[in-house]
Every structure is written in C-alpha cells, then in structure tokens.
From Swiss-Prot:
The lineage of its organism: Viruses, Duplodnaviria, Heunggongvirae, Uroviricota, Caudoviricetes. Pfam families: NinG. This is Protein ninG. InterPro entries: Phage_lambda_NinG (IPR008713). Residues 40-66 are annotated as: Disordered. Belongs to the ninG family.
Amino acid sequence: MMAKPARRRCKNDECREWFHPAFANQWWCSPECGTKIALERRSKEREKAEKAAEKKRRREEQKQKDKLKIRKLALKPRSYWIKQAQQAVNAFIRERDRDLPCISCGTLTSAQWDAGHYRTTAAAPQLRFDERNIHKQCVVCNQHKSGNLVPYRVELISRIGQEAVDEIESNHNRHRWTVEECRAIKAEYQQKLKDLRNSRSEAA
C-alpha cells in the first residue's frame, strides 16, 4: 500500500493552510484555492509571454534602426568621412600634446586648443592625417594668425628634427582620400586615443 503524500501548505498565499494532498502534484487545499492558483499561474505565464514579445519587438526595432543607420552612413558624402577622420586624429593630437605649449607662441593657456597643421589641408591634403604635420596650437595662432607658421617651423624642427620637416615640406604627392580610408583612419585614431588615455591612467 502506497504511503499518503506528506501534508503540505496550500500554495495560495492568502490561505497557506496545511492539508493532505490527494495526489503528489496537488498544491491547493480546496477547489477555490486551486482555481486561484491556476489563474495566478496563467497570469504569470501571460506576463512572461508579453515580456518576451516586447523584448523581441524591441530587438527587431533596434535591428531596423541599425539597418537604417547603415543605409544613411552609406549615403554620406566623402567630405563627411574626411571630417570624421580629421576629428578623430585631432582629438588624438590634442591628447598627445596635452602637456606641451602651443607649438607656435609657446603659451600654456588658451580659451581653446586646436590641432594645427604645419602644411594646411588645402595646400597638402596628402598630409592632413600625418601626425608629424599636426600639433597642439592655441586658437589665436591657428585661427587668427593663419597658423603662425614661422615660429611653428622653428619649434617643429626642435620636436621632430630637420629631416622630418624637410620630408613634410617636399611632399607634393597629392592624394585623394577614399571613404574606406577615412573610415579606417577614424577607427584607428579613436583606438589610439583610448589606448593613450588608458596608458596614462595606469601610469598615474
């Protein structure tokens, strides 16, 4: 003869009475409690299904947004990507030179710090992303004194050497930057900036 299941508490939170179940998986002491437990379970299952559906909907919505973003980026002109790449390079240069003075006038204070080119992007677009050609510069020298190039050159020789300056000045190999190149440069310099900041944090 099989032993009767041990008594247990009713799963209805409003009841919690002890009872002897008639079968192993009975968790209610009365039909009323059984109905309440079943309704609560169904409600929880429905809520779980709704959450899963909402999660799926959001995931699909994000996928569509990502696809739209990719399509929009694909339609961006080359000039957009040149600007994006230049911003990434300039941010790296400003961080690289953060403890140095303005390359032209030597000031350590400025309302704004720029990444100033020795040879301009208009005169030498092939050098627009060359780190040797870009240095931290105060806004006055860069934007109001046309780069203040005479003292810039003197300090540039001091920083990178005469040979490197000669290479920059004699480089006339015009280059048309492609979208693919600019995207790669942007990614490269965003990573370089991150690595530089991390290395400085570790050294601090």
